[in-house]
Structures are given as C-alpha cells and as structure tokens.
C-alpha cells in the first residue's frame, strides 16, 4: 500500500469510532467538548475513572490525531482537535448503525422468523440511541430547524418528544423572553430535562410533562397558543399502527396553535441524491422490518398536513441523509 494521505477512509473512521466510543463510555467526550484545556487528573476526577487509564486514553487520542497536545510537561495537557466536532458527527453515524442498532442487526435471522417476539426480546438501548443521535444531529439535523425557529422569534415553543430537554434549552438561550413546554413518554428523560432546566437557570421558563404525544388529541391545552410546535423524529413512531391518531394530532396542532407553525423533522423512505441513498435505504429498512414503522414520503407528509387544515407547507432537505424538515402554517 502506498504511503499517501487518503483522507477519511473506512479504516480511519473505524479507528476513530473505537476510540471515541471508549471515551463515551468513560464519560470523557463531553468533557473534551466543553473544556478548552484537559489533563488526565482533572478528566479522571470528572469521570470517576482511574487517572492512569485516562492518561493512556488521552495519549492514544493524541496519537490518533483526534486531540492536540498543548504541553508534554507533566501534567500533560490537551485540547480537542480542530476537526473534533466534525469527527464526532461522522462517527455518530457509525455508532448509531453498529452500536445502537446492534440488537437488530445481530439478531436479524430471529427478526425474520418472528418479528414481534424479536422486538420484545432485543430492544435497543435508549441511552445509546439518544447519544448517537445527538452525535449525528448536532451538525446534521439540529441546526436547520433551530435556525428556522430563531428566525420566527416565537414566544412559546412546544417540543413533542422532548427527551432530556436539550432542544428547548438551546432555543430559550437563543430567544430571550420565550417559554417552552416539553412532552415526552419517558419519565426518566423528563426528570433529566427538569434537572437540566434548573442547572441552566430556566425552571421558570420551561415546563416538562411526562405523557405520550397522543394525549394532545384529547387535551390540547399544552399546545394552546403555541407559536412553534416542533416534532423531531417522533411522528413516525405512530405509523402505521396509529395513523388515525397521527391525523388527529396534526388536526389538533392546526386547530389549537392558531397563529403557530408546526415543524416536523423526520426521514423519508427513499432518497434520490446519491449521497443520501445508502443511509436512507438502511434507515427505512431497519424501521420497516425491525421496528414495524412506516416512513412517509415528502408528498405523503404534504398531503397529510393539507388535510389537517394547514394552508402553507414547505419541505426542505437537511444535511442528514434522508432527513427532511416540513414547515406547516395556516
């Protein structure tokens, strides 16, 4: 093999993924992202990992070119490399595919024989799904809807499937005076969101509710007078089993957020651009054949939103392969 710089390759991504995933398990990656200067002792205390282990790990990251050495004098200090966040994004796709979705892929034969039983037997780790989705999303599908929302300057934002509250906290930081309501099925995620809001000094501006988003069909008080209703990769969870509920939910959003805009971020089943095709096809296959979900095309989403009563619907592509942002208003 010629000794040439080949840029990003399968092997370079694999090496980076191994090291970054180890760091994620240690709890070091977030520390590296937040701290301008890092040393082993400080990182070890923050993560609760033996200092010698963290020291060896940081040394390996520097040898891989993932972080930079600021000083070799003891204690050695480091900082994240100039392409650290970009690499996190790239590795996020590998990690989502081969770690978060490992229970599905590793047991594909059982899924083919008894899908319903296999889904119960081999659930994915919610924590892994959330973390790898964040790694993908921070560069690929968070910025566009967030920029669109900031441009609209809303006073009240409702987030359907709010998770640990990161989206709403970022929005309220960018939009002074705004308030937010988050709705999520997971009680543990809601608890995390409440703590995060308190740590951010936003408890008086944020409300988090543990409930399925379907509750809005019967009680729309939480979305009343919302300027923005945001639903990021959550609506497809209602398809195909609860399609009538999805339609009713869209009607409720249209009826009760009278002057508001509904922003849906989701995936389409088939993409035409060559850079999108492989991941979009794989994402659709996993959701369809391993999770009993059905993704809608751009035209199907547009038709649903018009039928729900919206008069203006716009569809935009994202930097996430197969990802689309739909903005609907009256």
Predicted features by range, described:
Residues 153-163:
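Conserved class I S-adenosyl-L-methionine
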Residues 193-194:
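Conserved SAM-binding loop
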Residues 164-176:
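Conserved SAM-binding loop of SAM-dependent methyltransferases across substrates and taxa
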